[in-house]
Amino acid sequence: SRGNIMPGECENKNHEALKVFQQLLLNYKGDQLEAVTQLQIGEIYRELGQFDNALLAFQEIIEKHQESIYIDETLYFSAEILNKKLNKPEEAKAFYEKIIFNHQDSIYFTDSREKYRILRGDITL
């Protein structure tokens, strides 16, 4: 049945999806699809625990697609990886700060502000 997933099956599907997205990226470089494709690549790397690769994919969006509708999401995911997975709170703080000052309408705004304040030492949990 479809509900029974074998060990490693999800990881294999992630690797397959990664290949597809990387091919899309080659075919549509500079296109509007580039930002969302990079976001998907970053997400897959994040799921696979390849956090440095995820950050590289997200950095592409941050550098080349500042006006993308995915920029706040990209900044937030970058901050979360740096804060929770790589234990780099100072670097994470910079990404949370960008959301706070530049993306007040983001769904990540409130959470980013709270985490920024914690990292800055204003509040403790």
Walk through the language-model features, giving the residues of each.
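Acidic, polar-rich low-complexity tracts and alpha-helical solenoid repeat scaffolds
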Residues: S1-L125
